[in-house]
């Protein structure tokens, strides 16, 4: 909350053993002068292979929370590794994935975004990945529920990026 840009490093590896300590993500805190220090106690233990990390204030409390999209389970392509939803509580990130259990093993996430797709003034979660369809999770007071959108049926594939924009210029 000091305004300095910190650095989150997601870990991944196909050849690493399951639960390897090398799969633990890292958070480096910027001291304001361009020097980063590795934090040792701000992230929960997460020893899985990830790919996409996004930040957004999904719970509306004024700080940035995180979603970490899991990718491949080491040594077991195309099985997905776990994804995580981390709530920022006074600078410490707590694993609250179990509040939205469908997020945990949704697929091999390539990219995710927080966006208010339904214009209800909270951040929803959209994601794409390998061997999956574009997926939307509606934010209902901090709990993410998967929804089905008309037009996204039968769209499974190898998706690698997603962008949110008002393409028709109508304000939504």
Model segments located where?
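Hydrophobic beta-strand segments that make up the repeating blades of beta-propeller
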Residues: 7-11, 66-70, 124-129, 172
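Beta-propeller blade termini
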Residues: 1, 42, 50-60, 64, ...
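Repeat-solenoid scaffold signature
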Residues: 128, 132, 141, 153-172
């Amino acid at each position: 909350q000091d305004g300095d840009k910190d650095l989150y490093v997601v870990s991944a590896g196909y050849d690493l053993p399951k639960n390897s300590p090398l799969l633990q993500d890292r958070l480096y805190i910027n001291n304001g002068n361009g020097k980063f220090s590795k934090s040792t106690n701000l992230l929960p233990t997460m020893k899985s292979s990830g790919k996409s990390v996004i930040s957004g204030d999904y719970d509306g409390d004024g700080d940035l929370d995180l979603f970490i999209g899991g990718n491949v389970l080491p040594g077991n392509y195309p099985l997905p590794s776990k994804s995580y939803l981390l709530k920022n509580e006074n600078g410490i990130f707590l694993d609250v994935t179990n509040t939205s259990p469908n997020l945990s093993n949704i697929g091999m996430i390539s990219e995710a975004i927080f966006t208010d797709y339904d214009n209800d003034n909270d951040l929803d979660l959209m994601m794409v990945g390998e061997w999956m369809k574009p997926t939307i999770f509606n934010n209902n007071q901090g709990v993410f529920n998967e929804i089905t959108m008309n037009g996204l049926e039968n769209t499974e594939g190898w998706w690698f990026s997603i962008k949110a924009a008002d393409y028709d210029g109508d304000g939504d």
